[in-house]
């Protein structure tokens, strides 16, 4: 007969081997005290540095993050930055991170080009501190808005309503990892919701939600897949087949992912071989059942994403209105702020501007923009 202590050890080992497959992001409810600290820190940094892109501020970002952020938030992000485990979903929702003064914010502009970044300055400091705690460094991409700064306002644009871009609204934005067509895509993303009065759900999909590696996923390690440039480019820019890459990469048991369903599967000009498209469709049949659309962000919520583990998107909506009790209610249009970051400037140096190591000039899977 086994002793009670031996049986206890066996049960413990059995429990530790049970994999808890993650199917949704971790939700962290920010306390009022933490919100107050973040607001005060944001105001302090505005006075000290003027702008979140101030080189002196960016150079000492990690120091500021660890000194000024509430300790609980710092610990969560620091652990998140190096957790690639089977249980890590790859996204965190910071619920009620900040309080947004809607009157001060004013009406949502018609598009991102009309954003008043003077009103967004404080939020830029707060977002950058979160990336700094990972630690990761905010960057900008010429492939997106020809740079456009370290913070991007994402606003529905009526002229782009039907597109698969952040400016779209009238169609579901398929889940995708940010800039899947780049070899040096962002490591981490933050999405700060200033307003979401249309009550648009955010969609998230994690490669970890599949559980253990399976035969369908193993085929995605083959470097045979087209990764077309996204809908922000003109048709003539994306029509020709480019270099190929794998969809899954990194560790063979706990992989990372580069994936854009809209461009790799449903884009008629993607140029996938029949083998590649068949593999992608088999994978999509599994992946689409694992998409999580349960969370509707409120004003002041922030979603922090590991771009190598978790893809993001959103449901279709009509900008500037929502339905309540069967009635159409007019409202302010959605407004969100996106920041992207890389953990190492050394590893991206071959694709950055000579005079700005935070500015990435990659056009397509290692190819650099030719601006001459």
Swiss-Prot record:
Protein role: Alpha-ketoglutarate-dependent dioxygenase that in vitro catalyzes the regio- and stereoselective hydroxylation of L-lysine, leading to (4R)-4-hydroxy-L-lysine.
GO molecular function: 2-oxoglutarate-dependent dioxygenase activity; metal ion binding
InterPro entries referenced in this protein's UniProt entry, alphabetically: TauD-like_sf (IPR042098)
Keywords assigned: Dioxygenase, Iron, Metal-binding, Oxidoreductase
Stated name of the protein: L-lysine 4-hydroxylase
The EC number(s) this enzyme carries: 1.14.11.-
UniProt: Fe cation binding residues: 176, 178, 312
Protein source organism: Flavobacterium sp. (strain CF136)
Cofactor note: Binds 1 Fe(2+) ion per subunit.
Extent of the signal sequence: none
Cofactor requirements of the protein: Fe(2+)
Family under the similarity heading: Belongs to the clavaminate synthase family.
Top-level enzyme category: oxidoreductase
SUPFAM superfamilies given in the database record: Clavaminate synthase-like
């Amino acid at each position: 007969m086994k002793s009670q202590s031996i049986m206890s050890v066996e049960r413990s080992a059995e429990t530790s081997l049970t994999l808890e497959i993650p199917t949704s992001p971790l939700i962290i409810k920010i306390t009022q005290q933490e919100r107050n600290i973040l607001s005060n820190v944001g105001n302090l940094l505005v006075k000290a540095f003027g702008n979140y892109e101030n080189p002196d501020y960016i150079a000492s970002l990690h120091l500021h993050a660890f000194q000024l952020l509430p300790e609980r938030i710092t610990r969560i992000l620091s652990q998140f930055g190096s957790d690639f485990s089977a249980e890590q979903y790859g996204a965190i929702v910071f619920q009620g991170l900040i309080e947004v003064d809607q009157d001060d914010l004013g009406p949502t502009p018609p598009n991102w080009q009309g954003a008043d970044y003077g009103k967004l300055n404080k939020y830029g400091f707060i977002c950058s501190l979160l990336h700094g705690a990972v630690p990761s460094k905010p960057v900008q991409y010429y492939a997106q808005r020809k740079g456009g700064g370290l913070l991007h306002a994402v606003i529905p644009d009526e002229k782009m309503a039907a597109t698969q871009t952040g400016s779209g609204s009238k169609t579901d934005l398929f889940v995708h990892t940010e800039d899947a067509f780049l070899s040096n895509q962002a490591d981490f993303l933050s999405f700060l919701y200033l307003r979401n009065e249309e009550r648009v759900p955010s969609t998230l999909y994690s490669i970890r939600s599949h559980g253990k590696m399976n035969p369908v996923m193993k085929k995605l390690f083959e470097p045979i897949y087209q990764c077309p440039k996204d809908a922000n480019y003109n048709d003539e820019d994306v029509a020709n087949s480019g270099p190929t890459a794998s969809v899954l990469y990194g560790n063979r048991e706990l992989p990372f992912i580069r994936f854009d369903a809209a461009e790799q599967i449903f884009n008629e000009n993607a140029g996938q071989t029949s083998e590649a498209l068949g593999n992608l469709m088999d994978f999509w049949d599994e992946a689409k059942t694992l998409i999580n659309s349960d969370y509707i962000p409120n004003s002041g919520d922030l979603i922090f994403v590991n771009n190598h583990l978790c893809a993001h998107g959103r449901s279709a909506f009509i900008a500037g209105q929502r339905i309540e009790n069967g009635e159409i209610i007019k409202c302010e249009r959605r407004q969100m702020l996106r920041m992207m970051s890389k953990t190492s400037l050394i590893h991206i140096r071959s694709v950055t501007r000579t005079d700005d190591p935070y500015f990435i000039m990659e056009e397509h899977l290692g190819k650099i923009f030719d601006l001459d």
